[in-house]
């Protein structure tokens, strides 16, 4: 059964009502001025805001990045006016009334974008795509649990913060939210409190046009503590009481199901029109008259409303001072752990982190995933910032280091005997790829550099997580994603598991570094680069063994994104090899070398290559000062290679269920076949140089391919 909180008494009910009413009027004024925005839920949630920022949250308006602050995440990010207005009321210096009025304006420097953005004060993560924020919140809660279990000592609870997340009806319809809710309950994250703005209205009408399940029962089934509050658009005291119960809960996260009214008090209350529309001048005037306000006054907050929050900056200063004093004493009492903690607060890895990594590259044939495995294991074993995990494919990806401890609810007893606690740094995410990467974003956002999240699964399944990876790029958050079993060499599992189109998507995402190394030397260089970059990276790795290129491939050169693997003076043709398919490119180049001066290039990361000087890029692609026929050989689609090559020998259909050694033959990845096609192309370009500008597809589709049956 859910806990239903009876109405609580409060001596401040009258003042609460004034704040709620003036807050609603301010929302309407702000939205009205530019004729757009999302007023409804911001109006309906005003009582929740008072309960949070007046009575519950630990925060410091003068130091919004205070390390041990409670984190608040607005998962239903379109309700951002709710958050901005309370930032203004509680005294966040940057959130002036002028800034509030810049919402939906053409002001380039507005701090009030249409959805909250991480670069602004007191915003923990960028939200907007529904379901992301609650997943990020699970990551933030994991971060807190792990830091507390790692560093807290008797008498020195230096990490005590909680995570509060507000969600709406639509958030709870999204897949990643449900994945994260399930995992949070399984982990027993009792430091996570979710407030559900339950107004039962969506864009197209009432929520029951699409959803009729019992949300509280769903959370209960996922091992959440559930508290229900009626009249949550008005009753501040009862929400505060619910939050107190939630804070006291041990062993489970808490959902506070707050029954609210969208557009409260206005003509469009309880109607979908309140979601994303201005009310209109007559409607705003009507609400102000109803509330006993001067309808001519716009953007007005009376002094007594400001006074209600006036102690919050001083309270925050005291909180910060006391915490800093506690940390100073901790550092004296535990100098080794203390210095390590301070370094992590600064976002620093151990200064000697590179020395943890293996120094010897593989000499024999080996999958590129094997090299990445050794690197992750070495870094994870020696660096507490690393928190790795996998989407139920640890047996294939195999990143666990010797002595690894799992991040798990310590009370959990599994049938297979696996156990752990909150100091563990390896997470079994289950088949929840989207949540995994969104949770990694939360870990990365806790405090930049305090955690280095590393996720892993088959490369194909990062497609499930693409929205979360995009959000990492948007927020400039750093995680390393280990995608194994890439290209068609994934093999017998067939085209459902062969990610022929995925690299094009991830290469297109700003601030995401897609890396596909050809051998262990490149893996070593690119993994090191991924650790150094301030952005997220995806290492796309082979299932099968690949050739090594000693004396030719280079860890250092790979960090520049592209280089000449094997040179030929005054080359007549160039072959770009990528990942596991470099073997075919390299061997085809040897055959071509009998007739043409042939150069072999490796371009494992186009984004890194694009960041090099134009002089360097020309020295690789046009070493002889002229464009020569350049053919890329890749086991994925050619889309995007037009910038670097003049023709492709790439996948132009989906894959097929065949063993790796057979599937390449089936799709024509044969050195002799490739050499024959490239030779014909070179001779055609000699006859018609304009072909160099047409980016031709040199690979034929298999005769038995489904496409050719149409």
Swiss-Prot record:
GO CC term, one of those recorded? nucleus
Q: Which cofactor does it need?
A: Mg(2+); Ca(2+); Mn(2+); Co(2+)
Enzyme class label: transferase
Q: Which UniProt keywords apply?
A: Magnesium, Metal-binding, Methanol utilization, Peroxisome, Thiamine pyrophosphate, Transferase
Q: Which InterPro entries match?
A: THDP-binding, Transketo_C/PFOR_II, Transketolase-like_C_2, Transketolase-like_Pyr-bd, Transketolase_BS, Transketolase_CS, Transketolase_fam, Transketolase_N
Q: Name one Pfam family in it.
A: Transketolase_C_1
PANTHER family linked to this entry:
TRANSKETOLASE, TRANSKETOLASE-LIKE PYRIMIDINE-BINDING DOMAIN-CONTAINING PROTEIN-RELATED
Name of the protein in its database record? Dihydroxyacetone synthase
Q: What organism does the UniProt record list as the source?
A: Pichia angusta
Whichever gene encodes this chain, its name is: DAS
